[in-house]
Amino acid sequence: MGETIRLTGVHETLLATLQARALDNRQPRPVLGDATAEELLRRIDYDFSRIRTATKDMRIVTFRARKLDEWAGRFLAVHPDAVVLHLACGLDSRAFRMDVPDTVEWIDVDVPDVIELRSRLYPERDGYRMIGASVTTEDWLDTVPRNRPALVVAEGLTPYLREADGEEMLRRVIRHLPTGAVMFDAVLPWTLRFAKYSQLLRATGATFGWGIGNPRSLESRVPGLRFQEQWSMLDSPFLADARPVEKWVGAGMRSIPQLRFAHRLLRYTF
């Protein structure tokens, strides 16, 4: 019998992300090659037909994860003594699939129910630990080192937050940490009106609450944050492996900024 899942709402969406990475691993040329995701899929007792993942969703998830892995790898190559905060980590295997220096302290953070599930699915390892807490609360930062460069990664988190909560979370994290980088995915504000048509959001009851327009607007609302770059999933070189119609649609969307950057990655330093 598999591990029983008791997650609802936004926390249930992590299972769709897991399914997307597992499906990618079965492709002739995987984007991420996350064999752990496929193993976890077999171990979990859950009706995945509720959140059936379409090919386009699989591509978004894996393009996003691959680019975040690349950005994180570049940061850790320069800062092998860093502390990594993976916020709303879900069941992601980033701490295990990346080539992480032994000197890095990696901390996965998510709500207690998710961390309890992770503790049953993932092994213990030196330099790795988990914190069970909502990332929008304050106390969990008390045990995070303040004397090391920090990498903050949030994947599939910010669109589900309220704007005030998301900005305060960033302010709190940056006040606590000395220097480093923040990288996360974000949606444009116009997408919030259409999120209700998402099959995944309808199935789980989750909602979108925060869209970020001009990435530089966060610099004035989160002191110390400095915008570096944005990257659209439509710019992934792996889109070349898509079906002809998907490549044609992608090319058309790339020519319109409001579509190209509707869902993209943002990278900041502080």
UniProtKB/Swiss-Prot annotation:
<keyword id="KW-0808">Transferase</keyword>
<keyword id="KW-0489">Methyltransferase</keyword>
<comment type="pathway">
    <text>Antibiotic biosynthesis; tetracenomycin C biosynthesis.</text>
</comment>
<dbReference type="GO" id="GO:0017000">
    <property type="term" value="P:antibiotic biosynthetic process"/>
</dbReference>
<dbReference type="InterPro" id="IPR016874">
    <property type="entry name" value="TcmP-like"/>
</dbReference>
<dbReference type="GO" id="GO:0008168">
    <property type="term" value="F:methyltransferase activity"/>
</dbReference>
<dbReference type="Pfam" id="PF04072">
    <property type="entry name" value="LCM"/>
</dbReference>
<comment type="function">
    <text>Catalyzes as well the following side reactions: methylation of 8-O-methyl-TCM D3 to 9-carboxymethyl-8-O-methyl-TCM D3; and of TCM B3 to 9-carboxymethyl-TCM B3.</text>
</comment>
<dbReference type="GO" id="GO:0032259">
    <property type="term" value="P:methylation"/>
</dbReference>
<dbReference type="InterPro" id="IPR007213">
    <property type="entry name" value="Ppm1/Ppm2/Tcmp"/>
</dbReference>
<keyword id="KW-0045">Antibiotic biosynthesis</keyword>
<protein>
    <recommendedName>
        <fullName>Tetracenomycin polyketide synthesis O-methyltransferase TcmP</fullName>
        <ecNumber>2.1.1.-</ecNumber>
    </recommendedName>
</protein>
<dbReference type="InterPro" id="IPR029063">
    <property type="entry name" value="SAM-dependent_MTases_sf"/>
</dbReference>
